[in-house]
Amino acid sequence: MSDLTDIQEEITRHEQQLVVARQKLKDAERAVEVYPDDVNKNTLQARQQTVSALEDKLADYKRRMADAVSRKKMDTKPTDPTGIEPDDHLKERSSLRYGNVLDVNAIDIEEPSGQTADWYTIGVYVIGFTIPIILKALYMLSTRGRQTVKENKGTRIRFKDDTSFEDINGIRRPKHLYVSMPTAQSTMKAEELTPGRFRTIVCGLFPTQIQVRNIMSPVMGVIGFSFFVKDWPEKIREFMEKECPFIKPEVKPGTPAQEVEFLKRNRVYFMTRQDVLDKNHVADIDKLIDYAASGDPTSPDDIESPNAPWVFACAPDRCPPTCIYVAGMAELGAFFSILQDMRNTIMASKTVGTAEEKLKKKSSFYQSYLRRTQSMGIQLDQRIILLYMLEWGKEMVDHFHLGDDMDPELRGLAQSLIDQKVKEISNQEPLKI
């Protein structure tokens, strides 16, 4: 509907309807105050929905009106015979044609897209919901994340569950969990939840619940995360007791041999790392940790906690703030991100194509994780990541899922049968299984 007259008529009609609807809403509110029965409550809810729908439609028509006026101005603008726009500063026409007009009115430069999120506000918002809706939303944004993002890109979605509701004047209403699904051009507010921020905060707050329900992101499944977390307490305990190549203790004469051996262990290096982290706290993250400690969240306070690796089960894009001051946790996430890059490099290497096509299939999970985590105020200890790689790198690579689980003999036999049948029914080249 591009005609200005028609749009103006629709705006006038909807404004009149909105006046009537708001009056009916006031009457319904008074009726509920006098007789708060189910009939009046349902009527009130219906009136509220009607007003909301009319307001949305009116706003849409006003946007259309603004667009139509803008287009009309552009159409009536006199064109310069030289082909130069009237406000262009060039004296002669450029060799480049004029492209799109990029509208930057919606961008707030006080809150650039690369900013650090307001983790305290985000954490308080998420903790205010029931566990079921949080975990179901996490499942939709991790296990089924690619599909959910694809279907809802560029919108602000609402998760709804019967366990999440609030009572307003005796009326039970759904309490929606809002998550923004940005595009590359979107500018996010500091307190706005995106899929990446949601996975980060929920993984950090509720790793035990995630472990019990075995919620896992596909990108973690294919690097053998299930194998890694099996017998984690024993695995990390053995790791801590091994000799650390980066420690050379200054031993005084007469020191017992047992104490000398202890001072060379990984555990001592982690204790030193913990001392460094304890001096680098950020006030907002400390507030979040204190707030979380007073409620249901189960954030690990030690790398040896049984639920510690489950913080990364849903592939958060940085170390969750609730465990960023636990020695070795941020580095464990970096170790997982390197494994993801290693698997993608293997997959890219075995595919057929040019070197450029193969490079496109590589990833940079590690660089992204490193940048995002360090923006939260800590520097990762590369030596700890190296210790993890030396200890578990080989066995993790052996447990990668590389999409080639078929036995070579079985594959060869199946391919020969395919080739034979294709030759019988056509003269086309058979595809590879």
UniProtKB/Swiss-Prot annotation:
Residues 1-175 are annotated as: Viral panhandle binding. Residues 69-90 are annotated as: Disordered. Residues 1-100 are annotated as: Chaperone activity. This is Nucleoprotein. InterPro entries: Hanta_nucleocap. The record marks D88, D103 as: Important for the endonuclease activity. Its EC number is 3.1.-.-. Encapsidates the genome protecting it from nucleases. The encapsidated genomic RNA is termed the nucleocapsid (NC) and serves as template for transcription and replication. The nucleocapsid has a left-handed helical structure. As a trimer, specifically binds and acts as a chaperone to unwind the panhandle structure formed by the viral RNA (vRNA) termini. Involved in the transcription and replication initiation of vRNA by mediating primer annealing. Plays a role in cap snatching by sequestering capped RNAs in P bodies for use by the viral RdRp during transcription initiation. Residues 4-71 form a coiled coil. Residues 175-217 are annotated as: Viral RNA-binding. Belongs to the hantavirus nucleocapsid protein family. Residues 150-175 are annotated as: Interaction with host RPS19. Homotrimer. Homomultimer. Homomultimerizes and binds to viral genomic RNA to form the nucleocapsid. Interacts with host MAP1LC3B; this interaction participates to the protection of Gn from virus-triggered autophagy. Interacts with host SNAP29; this interaction participates to the protection of glycoprotein N from virus-triggered autophagy. Interacts (via N-terminus) with host RPS19; this interaction probably mediates the loading of the 40S ribosomal subunit on viral capped mRNA during N-mediated translation initiation. Interacts with the viral RdRp. Interacts with host SUMO1 (via N-terminus). Residues 1-50 are annotated as: RdRP binding. GO terms for molecular function: endonuclease activity; RNA binding. Residues 1-79, 100-125, 377-425 are annotated as: Homomultimerization. It is found in: Virion; Host cytoplasm, Host perinuclear region; Host Golgi apparatus, Host cis-Golgi network. It comes from Puumala virus (strain P360).
